[in-house]
Amino acid sequence: MGLTGRKSEKGPVCWRRRVKSEYMRLRQLKRFRRADEVKSMFSSNRQKILERTDILNQEWKLRRIQPVHIMTPVSSLRGTRECTVDSGFSEFSRQVIPLKTLNAVASVPVMYSWSPLQQNFMVEDETVLHNIPYMGDEILDQDGTFIEELIKNYDGKVHGDRECGFINDEIFVELVNALNQYSDNEEDDEEDDHHDYKFEKMDLCDGKDDAEDHKEQLSSESHNNDGSKKFPSDKIFEAISSMFPDKGSTEELKEKYKELTEQQLPGALPPECTPNIDGPNAKSVQREQSLHSFHTLFCRRCFKYDCFLHPFQATPNTYKRKNMENLVDSKPCGIYCYMYMVQDGMVREYPAGVVPERAKTPSKRSTGRRRGRLPNSNSRPSTPTVNSETKDTDSDREGGADGNDSNDKDDDDKKDETTSSSEANSRCQTPVKLKLSSEPPENVDWSGAEASLFRVLIGTYYDNFCAIARLIGTKTCRQVYEFRVKESSIIARAPAVDENTPQRKKKRKHRLWATHCRKIQLKKDGSSNHVYNYQPCDHPRQPCDSSCPCVTAQNFCEKFCQCSSECQNRFPGCRCKAQCNTKQCPCYLAVRECDPDLCLTCGAAEHWDSKNVSCKNCSIQRGAKKHLLLAPSDVAGWGIFIKEPVQKNEFISEYCGEIISQDEADRRGKVYDKYMCSFLFNLNNDFVVDATRKGNKIRFANHSVNPNCYAKVMMVNGDHRIGIFAKRAIQTGEELFFDYRYSQADALKYVGIEREMEIP
């Protein structure tokens, strides 16, 4: 690399020239490195092939080859064509064999590669044309401007077209580091000029001795500056931004350079990453930071990580649970429980002899846990009442006292087993009581992992300190309570339960919902053209009025919405006692499947592992598809055949594929129209299902104006999904057809043969 002289230019034009020259140099070096890697890999593979060939040659030399005996053909038959094989080795005799002509075999239809899917897959829009499709000379002759129009749809962006405009993260960092040398060289020139001026002034004023001292001081300062690596100048990022405007502004490039250089440091964590709570580097962080990965990666609509159906849709961070575990045990868990701890700022002590006397007395109360409010200072009894149930619990340390018999040991074993199972399912129920040691708790320090875990659990169990202590495992409820008091300013209180307002009855809720449907004039045929994608609404403490996104999109509020459970726009489900396959069912009328969380009487929530369910309106979400066979079609290309008989209106399969936007579907559709093969299916006004690259076998079902199947877009747990149903009774082995809803001109263009109708 050739650097400029000491008196180099410093204007923006010069920096642009430097960016271009360094970029071309780095691209060339990368190309050379890639060529060297290919050469070395080719040489290595070639060497392995030669070594393997030598081994095989040695094995063949040790073997004795025996000739293959061929039966002599009958030469008396006329018209028989013979094939003669002569060998150059004396060990092999001349071989003559008759030729047999094979009949022509029909070739299989053309099929483009595709990836099988069992559910829809959301993908981003492709803003760059990855490859220019080959259409054949005939299509290009008919429409020579097709390729140009296709490139215009992608704003002229073609992968690999702009060789000089390509810059990835690796080249970007190398380019900044290379340009930083120019910046350092300019600063050195300025410092040298400044130092020379100071030296001349000091020689004239203070003499040689003072000048030497100042020289040593300045040289030491320059040495220290060289030891610390400086951040690149803003001129570098301004020049790169001017050369590559699509990569971002100057500030964005600076932030990107910081992130990339920090990631290259040893032991560096990704941005917004909290150390493992079980690792040695665990830190004490807030609840939001501990749950950041959970809120980012966990889909609250599918209840799984890395959801492919909602990866680009932000979901609310809080999900309202109906049964929130904010109830606290009214009984203390032991004599050292936090309930006995503080009254008027003083710690109350109890004699140790109280526990054995109480423990020896059998309890007449039931062993079931009662839940109530935390007793306050006014309602707390003056004397502790500890029964046998509280003897072996988390704050009672007298577990090994005399007087315990074999029955107590058996009870302890059962409690320990129950504790381990409850800790594994802490989100479902409050953990049962855990036996700890007999010594009173001492003031101990909280580690970062324990403090972070406490802040996570306090948002679920609130003031149930006994349960939180059992989940943490290393702290007692008394210590948890003390830590809670210290952090009372940053932790939310438990939500108050309004016991005076009774819950609205189910029948009244359905009646109000029916009135609401009549107000918005719900169409019973479900043929509305305005079908929009559902997004959960999130407007706290505000009703779902005209500003609500669900009301604006003419969608019902679902269970994922953050609005009140009494919202008049919230779909309440059905109360059917039948099969939910008629318009008497509100779910069937609204063209949606029964929700197992809402429809509790029709059987949608029962027998989840079985296909024999009373509700017939939950087949898509259960995946109750039929067995389909792929074979060449009598109409066109490949077809799909059914292996089992199907009744009318019975679910056959779901039409799966990539979920793309309407704009992306328009760009892809222009290419598919030229191929005269399209797998696009409108899902709603926002998205389209494309089964060209990814899909399931139902994608091979052909078009017919007299089909035996029909497609229906249904709302399934907040998502639009396409179901294929039987239009009539279908026998085993029949090919499946449904109407693509082509226009008459498109039907003649794309479908050349109509299937033969069965004669009744």
Curated annotation (Swiss-Prot):
Stored SMART domains: CXC, SANT, SET
Protein location: Nucleus
GO-annotated biological processes: circadian rhythm; digestive tract development; fin regeneration; heart development; heterochromatin formation; methylation; negative regulation of gene expression, epigenetic; positive regulation of circadian rhythm
Region feature (Disordered): 208-231, 356-444
Basic residues bias (residue ranges): 361-373
EC number(s) on file: 2.1.1.356
Chemical reaction(s) catalysed: L-lysyl(27)-[histone H3] + 3 S-adenosyl-L-methionine = N(6),N(6),N(6)-trimethyl-L-lysyl(27)-[histone H3] + 3 S-adenosyl-L-homocysteine + 3 H(+)
Sequence ranges assigned to domain CXC in this UniProt record: 517-619
Keyword Methyltransferase included in the entry's annotation: yes
All residue ranges annotated as the SET domain in the record: 626-741
Biased composition (Polar residues): 375-388
Uppermost EC category: transferase
Major localization listed first in the record, in broad terms: nucleus
Alphabetically ordered keywords of this record: Biological rhythms, Chromatin regulator, Methyltransferase, Nucleus, Repressor, S-adenosyl-L-methionine, Transcription, Transcription regulation, Transferase
Listed Gene3D superfamilies: SET domain
Alphabetical list of CDD domains matching this protein: SANT, SET_EZH2
Molecular functions (GO terms): chromatin binding; histone H3K27 methyltransferase activity; histone H3K27 trimethyltransferase activity; promoter-specific chromatin binding; transcription coactivator activity; transcription coregulator activity
Pfam families: Ezh2_MCSS, EZH2_WD-Binding, PRC2_HTH_1, preSET_CXC, SET
Stored InterPro entries: CXC_dom (IPR026489), EZH1/2-like (IPR045318), EZH1/2_MCSS (IPR048358), EZH1/EZH2 (IPR021654), EZH2_SET (IPR044439), PRC2_HTH_1 (IPR041343), Pre-SET_CXC (IPR041355), SANT/Myb (IPR001005)
CC annotations in GO: ESC/E(Z) complex; nucleus
Bias type Basic and acidic residues, positions: 389-400
Function: Polycomb group (PcG) protein. Catalytic subunit of the prc2/eed-ezh2 complex, which methylates 'Lys-9' and 'Lys-27' of histone H3, leading to transcriptional repression of the affected target gene. May regulate the circadian clock via histone methylation at the promoter of the circadian genes.
Assembly notes: Component of the prc2/eed-ezh2 complex.
Stated family: Belongs to the class V-like SAM-binding methyltransferase superfamily. Histone-lysine methyltransferase family. EZ subfamily.
Name under which the protein is recorded: Histone-lysine N-methyltransferase EZH2
